[in-house]
A protein has these predicted regions:
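N-terminal glycine-rich phosphate/pyrophosphate-binding loops that anchor nucleotide-derived ligands
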Residues: 1-89, 364-366
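Glycine-rich anion-binding loops of enzyme active sites
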Residues: 60, 96-190, 338
Length: 372
């Protein structure tokens, strides 16, 4: 039986590459004066003199990291790149070049893959990133996306970057924005078994930059399903915030991909410190609290995929950062706790409840190979 003429198997690898390159060019993500991209054996890029390179890689596998009955191809492309850009933001760097490799079964619709590239290309162009190439291979069972992003330190900071290993007792523990939004979206999908809603979110945003799409979770109105789905499907990489943290003199940051407690545990381990998190200081939107009155704390601390920045700062750095946030129209940072000396008995993180009780909490970051 011949393959469906609208699928990859019928079009072929090299014709698909040409179509994908055209899709990137249409959204302005395929060329730059300092880069030789798609069409050669390797890309050539000229980094800015005096900067330090930052490299990150992520893979997304169907039915492990995403479900195409829950998300559109365009949203999948956006999120696949956004997770990599978020890693660069967490280093206090700027992304410059991306490569995308696809593992395809052959049954993927051509129109879907073009939309995937339009989604990631639109986000790339919004942040000055060029998609410089990649690879296409056959996959016998399921779709896989593998992205690498190369960035560089901002030229005006003498190569300074943010890492996880320089937190000190007495530092304030801070996040760049609200927690629990993406987990609320995933919980909505899991509870509702929404199938077919994937197009509704994308269609309502047609003609808008995906990079700027964001839900209204201010609490001024009742939350809607789409509010949470947008937060889950289209995270915003906090590149400008990472730059502001470096400018203010910050040293430590990471992005919140595996949940607050899980990611904070990584900072504690790398820096050899402990931490106290204040329940009453967690910036959880009213809409999340209203929709999940018994579970908002779990969503905010263990849900993951918020892609806000978690960082530490001394008082002087925080004062400078607040001023920079006002000047650059960035959200005010939220202080959620303090870094402490490592406790004598593990775990290193304690949650101070509203009533003043302190509870030890485990990290519990997502583990691809954990049982259960």
């Amino acid at each position: 039986m011949p393959p469906d003429p609208q699928t990859v198997a019928a079009l072929g690898e090299f014709a698909l590459i040409d179509r994908l390159a055209t899709a990137l060019a249409e959204v302005g993500a395929a060329a730059a004066p300092d880069l030789l991209g798609i069409g050669d054996d390797a890309a050539i890029w000229m980094p800015t003199p005096g900067t330090r390179a930052v490299i990150t890689t992520d893979s997304l596998i169907a039915r492990i990291h995403f479900r195409l009955d829950w998300t559109s191809w365009r949203d999948l492309g956006h999120k696949a790149l956004a997770t990599n850009l978020s890693d660069v933001a967490a280093m206090g760097a700027r992304p410059r070049v991306a490569t995308v490799s696809l593992a395809l079964t052959g049954a993927e619709p051509i129109a879907g893959l073009l939309d995937l590239y339009r989604g990631l290309g639109t986000l790339a162009a919004a942040h000055g990133v060029v998609v410089a190439g990649g690879d296409i291979v056959a996959s016998p069972e399921r779709l896989g996306l593998h992205l690498t992003v190369v960035g560089e330190s901002w030229p005006d900071f003498d190569g300074r970057l943010l890492t996880r290993d320089r937190a000190r007792p007495g530092d304030l523990l801070v996040v760049s924005g609200p927690l629990g939004r993406s987990a609320a979206g995933l919980e909505t999908l899991l509870r509702s078994s929404i199938v077919g809603r994937r197009s509704s979110v994308s269609d309502r945003s047609a003609g808008k930059s995906l990079a700027s799409a964001s839900p209204d979770l201010s609490g001024d109105r009742r939350p809607t399903t789409d509010d949470f789905l947008v937060a889950h499907h289209r995270p915003t990489p906090q590149i400008a915030y990472g730059r502001a943290i470096v400018a203010a003199g910050g040293r430590v940051a990471m992005d919140l991909s595996d949940g607050l407690f899980g990611d904070l545990a990584k900072i504690c381990a790398r820096s050899g410190v402990g931490a106290i998190v204040e329940e009453g200081a967690l910036p959880v939107p009213d809409a999340v609290r209203a929709a999940f009155p018994d579970e908002w704390l779990r969503l905010a601390t263990r849900g993951g995929e918020d892609y806000e920045l978690l960082f530490t700062a001394d008082v002087a750095t925080m004062d400078r950062l607040r001023d920079l946030c006002v000047a650059r129209d960035l959200p005010a940072p939220a202080i959620i706790g303090i870094i402490t000396a490592p406790p004598a008995i593990a775990p290193p993180i304690r949650l101070r409840r509203i009533d003043g009780r302190e509870e030890p909490v485990g990290g519990g970051a997502f583990d691809h190979f954990a049982g259960g």
